[in-house]
Design a protein with these regions (language model features):
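Short, solvent-exposed segments of well-ordered alpha helices
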Residues: 21, 25, 57-60, 121-124, ...
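Conserved protein kinase catalytic/activation segment
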Residues: 38-49
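Active-site activation/catalytic loop segments of kinase-like enzymes and analogous catalytic loops
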Residues: 48, 55-114, 130-144
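A short beta-strand motif that forms part of the nucleic acid-binding face
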Residues: 34, 54-55
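Regulatory N- and C-terminal appendages and interdomain linkers associated
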Residues: 2-6, 46, 120-167
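Catalytic-loop of the protein kinase fold
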Residues: 29-31, 36
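Pre-DFG segment of protein kinase catalytic domains
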Residues: 29, 49-52
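An alpha-helical support segment within catalytic cores of ATP-dependent transferases
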Residues: 1-29, 42, 116-117
Length: 167
């Protein structure tokens, strides 16, 4: 990618080309910020407590909350924000993120099976997830390394979507 603007443009074009599928699920009640840092596991009650819901518009496409979960589960958002990721370089000096998660594809496969069982398209969840990474850039502008990692992760995910479409 030539820059963040080209990523925004591509994601926008891909979302618009999938608009019918994206909107097909209608609007449901939404937490609005369904990431791991807003979940508390209560072992004594054998439950998960969701905190810090977004106010305002409580109804959204379910793809949004699914993408927020994927953002944490598969995207590595929490690893980046909590400084648990590293920027590395291949022999050709191509940058990539290294973080200790998803080495085992079973989590991704299980999540994608869950999506497909509800007739949700994993590629649309991935597109929304990329838009989330891009939308986080100005929120972390005080930390150049995090901004670079968020943009790099968005780029990696877009490349994965493009590779999937080319199969």
């Amino acid at each position: 990618f030539s820059g963040v603007d080209s990523m925004f443009s591509l994601v926008n074009d891909l979302l618009l080309s999938n608009e019918k599928s994206f909107l097909s699920k209608g609007s449901l009640f939404s937490h609005g910020d369904l990431c791991f840092s807003n979940m508390i596991l209560s072992e004594s009650e054998d439950s998960i407590i969701f905190i810090d819901p977004r106010g305002g518009d409580s109804f959204r496409t379910p793809y949004y909350d699914l993408a927020k979960i994927s953002h944490s589960l598969l995207g590595g958002y929490d690893h980046i924000i909590n400084n648990k990721a590293s920027i590395c370089f291949n022999s050709d000096m191509t940058a990539f993120l290294d973080f200790d998660m998803n080495k085992d594809k079973s989590v991704k496969d299980l999540f994608n099976s869950f999506l497909e069982s509800g007739d949700y398209k994993p590629e649309i969840v991935a597109l929304v997830q990329v838009s989330l990474f891009l939308s986080m850039l100005p929120l972390h502008i005080e930390d150049t390394k995090k901004v670079y990692m968020l943009a790099l992760r968005a780029s990696e995910l877009i490349s994965g979507i493009k590779d999937h479409k080319n199969r």
